[in-house]
Amino acid sequence: MAIVSSSAGRADSQPPAAKSRVVDASPLPEEASPAREDGLRPRRLEDYIGQRELKQVLAIAVKAAMGRGDALDHVLLYGPPGLGKTTMAMVLAEELGVKCRVTSAPALERPRDIVGLLVNLQPREVLFIDEIHRLTRVAEELLYPAMEDRRLDLTVGKGSTARTRALELPPFTLVGATTRAGALSSPLRDRFGLIQRLEFYGLEDLQAIVERAAGLLRLQLTAQACQEIARRCRGTPRIANRLLRRVRDVASVCGGESLIDAALVDEALTLHRVDARGLDASDRRLLDLLLESHGGGPVGLETLAAALGEDPATLEAVVEPFLLQLGFLQRTPRGRVVTGAGRRHLGWPELP
């Protein structure tokens, strides 16, 4: 399976970027290319750890499509960042024995960008579009007949001499990935034959992912060390692999021993200010501010953002979700409140 990547981008209405965080599930610049992951990505469904129900559904769909000699139905994968949507698209292409052409919606700014991709597709190839919810209206309208009728409608000429020309396309599979399925237009969403959500990973699967990645990186970790990384990675394989690389760095410089144990993992991740539950400095700053200056809340988002020197959209989209997921923070009509669990984690007494 070959990967063909298109990475040109454009500005778009996204939440402002937060400062670089080792526990941020969004890809760092060095992780942006699918081909640059130290070979940690699985290549086949049998190597893909976790997401059991998703794998079962897709394995049946792939086998059926290959039996018919036809392209796989179009697939929409959605869920939080870092759970393996891009990896799954590449795995599907590998299972089908075809190329995976990789791009993202911001790279498809002009009509000719999407037209160029579509006309160069070979039969049954996979076209992967990341952040598909950010497609322009023009790009979406070009995709409608391509997905449904395997046809590209092109307008030739201008004004009164303009004519529409239909160009036949080979059978292909569009795999779209998004963290915001609700932001897709209904006409686009309805053209996907398979719509599947990726879930956060459990501790057992994450430990298996760390063990596999350690083997590929030629690192020796104890079972307890793998478990320690798995506990701190926020249920996200991308973060697990990133934390493993940071542990590798510390081990190669300070470790001395060839076997990495839980104590060394704790030392390395404490250096990066990632605690036993996966909270980093940004998470703790928010909770500490609420507790120390406001008695645990409630406090409005704008007030918190001003006190922390952060953009409100960044706090809401980047920092708060994991705290809400852990049950350390609540959003109420009057503002943000630290929960009893959040107080206990930071060593504060619970309210009477």
Curated annotation (Swiss-Prot):
Q: Which GO terms describe its molecular function?
A: ATP binding; ATP hydrolysis activity; four-way junction DNA binding; four-way junction helicase activity
Q: Which residues bind ATP?
A: 40-41, 82, 85-87, 191, 201, 238
Q: Name one GO cellular component term.
A: Holliday junction resolvase complex
Where does the record place the region Disordered? 1-42
Subcellular location as annotated? Cytoplasm
Cystine residue pairs: none
Which residues participate in Mg(2+) binding? 86
What EC number(s) are associated with this protein in UniProt?
3.6.4.-
Q: Where is this region: Large ATPase domain (RuvB-L)?
A: 13-201
**A GO term (biological process) for this protein?**
DNA recombination
Q: Which Pfam families match?
A: AAA_lid_4 (PF17864), RuvB_C (PF05491), RuvB_N (PF05496)
Residues reported in the UniProt entry to bind DNA: 331, 336
Record text on subunit structure and interactions: Homohexamer. Forms an RuvA(8)-RuvB(12)-Holliday junction (HJ) complex. HJ DNA is sandwiched between 2 RuvA tetramers; dsDNA enters through RuvA and exits via RuvB. An RuvB hexamer assembles on each DNA strand where it exits the tetramer. Each RuvB hexamer is contacted by two RuvA subunits (via domain III) on 2 adjacent RuvB subunits; this complex drives branch migration. In the full resolvosome a probable DNA-RuvA(4)-RuvB(12)-RuvC(2) complex forms which resolves the HJ.
By sequence similarity, the record places it as follows: Belongs to the RuvB family.
Query: Tell me, what does this protein do in biology?
Result: The RuvA-RuvB-RuvC complex processes Holliday junction (HJ) DNA during genetic recombination and DNA repair, while the RuvA-RuvB complex plays an important role in the rescue of blocked DNA replication forks via replication fork reversal (RFR). RuvA specifically binds to HJ cruciform DNA, conferring on it an open structure. The RuvB hexamer acts as an ATP-dependent pump, pulling dsDNA into and through the RuvAB complex. RuvB forms 2 homohexamers on either side of HJ DNA bound by 1 or 2 RuvA tetramers; 4 subunits per hexamer contact DNA at a time.
The molecule here is called: Holliday junction branch migration complex subunit RuvB
Q: Which organism is it from?
A: Prochlorococcus marinus (strain MIT 9313)
Q: Which gene encodes it?
A: ruvB
